[in-house]
Regions:
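Short, well-ordered beta-strand micro-motif
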Residues: 62-66, 278-280
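Short glycine- and acidic-rich boundary segments immediately preceding or forming the N-terminal edge
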Residues: 2-59
Length: 325
């Protein structure tokens, strides 16, 4: 791997491992340690690349598995909403599987920490016992409302809930989104001999697989194909987790009247005509029966022991990401 990338990784301080929520919660330091180890390996099956920087200068890192210029590409994102660590854990579990058996007929790109500043803020809150909801990046922008497709459309959710769904000053105004939109644009991938035909974003919670559009009530031109892929994933998740099949919904129809302009899901589809899925990881494992959990936002989104669920979700998602199902 490039010495410059290793030096850049070493230049960013890392917090100690997190044990506040669970002994198995790795926290930002654990996630970065996994990526740092990869940067030091001479592996033919994986390549680590810095795609950009966050508002506060943290590296935005992507990992490519499989052969470059193979013609087809999958993209996996997690951590856009930094409270949703089960999505991040699932992405790392998926990367473990891809690293063990890299695909031979496509590239798979994973960006596991798409909002590093937000993840570090959540971790700091947990360490200090602050029960706060964190959805945004360091500038208070919801990165999943900042992508450069349909960004300017009216949203009732944003009108009623204001800052919770803050979209930013302009489409792709945030450095994290801008880096993703530039690096994985149709033109940039075409120059590298690749076409993105599958995309996946990992969130929490709700036990739902969402398909485009989020910005419109109407269905996409490829609705039947999108829905079929989503049902296959939802059924495999049910089999692997033992929680039953997840629901499949068009994003804009999940909460009637609450559209979501500027989503990554719509950008995947509008930019690439790709199969585009958003998985709301976890469903029956929030353990909110205790009243004390009602006032801890982190527990709304994450199981106490995330790694077992993450491993099951990764098994279910691997065929989709590899283009095998």
């Amino acid at each position: 791997m490039h010495a410059a990338l290793i030096a850049a990784l070493a230049a960013h301080p890392q917090a100690p491992a997190l044990h506040t929520v669970s002994p198995t919660a790795r926290g930002y330091a654990g996630y970065r340690a996994w990526l740092d180890r990869l940067a030091r390996l001479e592996s033919a099956g994986a390549h680590l690349e810095q795609l950009g920087e966050s508002v506060r200068g943290e590296p935005l890192l992507g990992v490519r598995f499989g052969r470059s210029q193979s013609g087809r590409c999958s993209l996996v994102l997690s951590g856009l909403h930094p409270m949703e660590w089960i999505g991040v854990e699932t992405c790392f579990a998926l990367m473990d599987r891809l690293n063990d058996a890299p695909p031979e007929d496509r590239e798979v790109w994973c960006v596991p920490l798409a909002n590093p500043d937000g993840i570090r803020r959540v971790e700091a809150n947990l360490r200090h016992g602050r029960r706060r909801m964190v959805r945004h990046n360091a500038r208070g922008v919801d990165l999943n409302r900042n992508f450069p497709r349909y960004w300017g459309r009216f949203s009732l959710a944003r009108l009623l809930l204001g800052p919770l769904f803050a979209r930013g000053a302009a489409a792709a105004s945030e450095p994290e989104v801008r880096a993703l939109a530039e690096r994985f644009s149709q033109a940039a991938l075409r120059d590298r001999g690749c076409r993105l035909d599958r995309a996946l974003s990992l969130h929490s919670f709700g036990g739902v697989v969402l398909i485009p559009y989020g910005a419109f009530w109407r269905r996409t031109a490829h609705y039947a194909e999108q829905a079929r892929a989503a049902r296959d994933v939802a059924e495999r998740i049910g089999e692997e987790t033992g929680q039953g099949a997840y629901r499949v919904l068009q994003s804009a129809r999940w909460v009637p009247g609450f559209t979501a302009p500027g989503m990554e899901l719509d950008w995947f589809y509008a930019e690439h005509s790709a199969l585009s899925l958003l998985v709301e990881c976890s469903r029956k494992n929030q353990r909110l029966s205790a009243p004390s959990a009602w006032f801890e936002p982190f527990r709304w989104f994450n199981p106490t022991d995330p790694q077992q669920l993450a491993a099951a979700l990764a098994r279910a998602l691997t065929p989709y990401v590899r283009g095998e199902a």
